[in-house]
Design a protein with these regions (language model features):
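Extracytoplasmic catalytic/substrate-binding loops of multi-pass membrane glycan-assembly enzymes
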Residues: 4-20, 24-51, 55-59, 256-260, ...
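Juxtamembrane segments of multi-pass membrane glycosylation machinery
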Residues: 29-30, 44-67, 87-90, 105, ...
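Membrane-interface anchor segments at the N-terminal boundary of transmembrane helices
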Residues: 62-63, 68, 284-368
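Multi-pass, polyprenyl lipid-linked donor-dependent membrane glycosyltransferases
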Residues: 64-71, 98-125, 130, 139, ...
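Transmembrane-helix motifs of polytopic, lipid-linked glycan transferases
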Residues: 66-87, 125, 342-346
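Transmembrane-helix signature of polytopic, membrane-embedded enzymes
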Residues: 79-102, 357-362
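Membrane-interface alpha helices of multi-pass inner-membrane proteins
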Residues: 141-156, 166-168, 185-193
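Membrane-proximal stem/loop segments at transmembrane-domain junctions that anchor or position
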Residues: 204-307
Length: 418
């Protein structure tokens, strides 16, 4: 945090700039054609940062870097307690703590003042209180879970996938236990986050005396199916299409939607008619999204391409492709393989041995499955996949604990036979 004067860039920088300006009474960034007018899904994140700046009236983005640091510690604490609730095995819980803090993309994302980090923090505690409610039945835990889930969706709308995953567990519990009160919690999981989102948009519409429609969602789906040969990015990654089509159609929502629908339909028809190319496109998109171990966490910080200032050689070596950059990227790539190995072992061999914890822990599998489907269709980046992997850590820890037990028994049998 203190090794650079990094002021943020791109979406994160614009949201912070908007929070400072809005708190000062300047609403220029929500005028027709401006950033928040085009992307009203960011209004929850904007409002969260405005609230923080009300409480800490320092118009510097490092306030959020410090907040991110606290959130990383908080979400790792939540992961520890989630593991306790699921498996009640001290060794598994301790291993999950070690694995959480060994997950360095969170550390580097401290410099990423954006909804991904805030959303993951709130999601972690939403899951913790959700599990406590199912284990102990206290209404207070259900309320806290709804509050945290609402905040998670408020700052990052992609967390609708987590809402669906947790609701899936509640529906499963309803069918198994015939406790229909769980369905009330399902209703609350959808009603409160959606209401908060709607209320936020309505507030800004009333404040600015205008209807804020935003860029149609189909534009992101159309972008997610693009494969530009001249692009530096992988197939299905962000291309700037959403921004470009808005400018090209001069903000005409009907024309934007019509053009995006046409592009989407044309691309779908092409992929259906060329199955080999479709297979290459989606496999490349999947692999590039889910096998990049840094999750763009270093790239999210002070970028060499953007000439952002760094104050010493240590930070420069990390962020400007030096020796430390190579070291950390290699470490994170290897660590991702370790996580995948543990996860595969858990779902293949450990899951059936974990009793009720396995059933409750299915939220992580449903969340991961939903994330894979969503980002296969919509726009993707490797940074988007981070939450889906991080929330698997309790299961990965259980997988490695089971793997260690099997290996220990095998070695003992070998010693006896020798």
């Amino acid at each position: 945090i203190f090794l650079t004067s990094f002021a943020g860039r791109d979406d994160a920088g614009t949201v912070f700039k908007g929070a400072v300006q809005f708190n000062a009474g300047n609403f220029s960034l929500i005028k027709p054609g401006a950033y928040f007018y085009r992307y009203p899904h960011q209004l929850g994140l904007l409002s969260f940062e405005r609230l923080i700046l009300y409480l800490i009236p320092l118009p510097v983005i490092s306030v959020f870097y410090v907040l991110n640091l606290g959130m990383v510690i908080g979400m790792n604490y939540a992961t520890w307690k989630i593991t306790d609730e699921l498996f009640t095995k001290p060794l598994v819980s301790r291993l999950s703590v070690i694995m959480s803090f060994g997950f360095l993309p969170l550390v580097f994302n401290i410099m990423f003042a954006y909804g991904l980090m805030y959303g993951l923090f709130f999601s972690s505690f939403a899951i913790l209180f959700f599990l406590r409610y199912l284990r102990r039945g206290k209404v207070r835990n259900a309320i806290l879970s709804v509050v945290m889930l609402s905040l998670a969706y408020w700052v990052r709308s992609n967390n609708i996938i987590l809402i669906i995953a947790l609701s899936g567990i509640l529906i499963l519990m309803t069918l198994r236990e015939k406790r229909y009160r769980y369905l009330l919690l399902v209703l609350a999981f959808f009603a409160f986050p959606m209401s908060l989102h709607k209320a936020t948009t309505s507030y800004y519409e009333i404040t600015t005396h205008q209807k804020i429609s935003g860029t149609p969602q189909i534009a992101w789906l159309a972008m997610g199916l693009q494969d530009k040969p001249d692009s530096k990015r992988m197939p299905g990654w962000y291309t700037g299409y959403v921004r470009d089509i808005y400018a090209k159609k001069k903000g005409n929502i009907e024309k934007i939607e019509k053009s995006a629908n046409h592009l989407f339909d044309r691309r779908v028809q092409y992929l259906l008619a060329h199955p080999d190319e479709a297979s290459w496109f989606f496999s490349t998109k999947f692999i590039s999204s889910w096998t990049e171990g840094s999750f763009q966490s270093i790239w999210n910080g002070p970028s060499k391409d953007k000439f952002q200032p760094l104050w010493n050689r240590f930070a420069t070596s990390i962020y400007h492709d030096g020796t430390l950059h190579l070291f950390f990227v290699t470490y994170m790539q290897g660590y991702l393989l370790v996580l995948y190995l543990g996860g595969a072992f858990y779902y293949a061999f450990t899951y059936k041995r974990m009793g009720d914890g396995a059933t409750l822990g299915l939220y992580a599998f449903l969340y991961l499955f939903g994330g894979i489907l969503f980002h296969l269709i919509s726009e993707t980046k490797s940074q988007y996949t981070l939450p889906y992997i991080y929330l698997q850590i309790p299961m990965i820890a259980a997988g490695y604990n089971h793997m260690t037990q099997i290996l220990s028994r095998y070695l003992k049998n070998m010693q006896k036979s020798s």
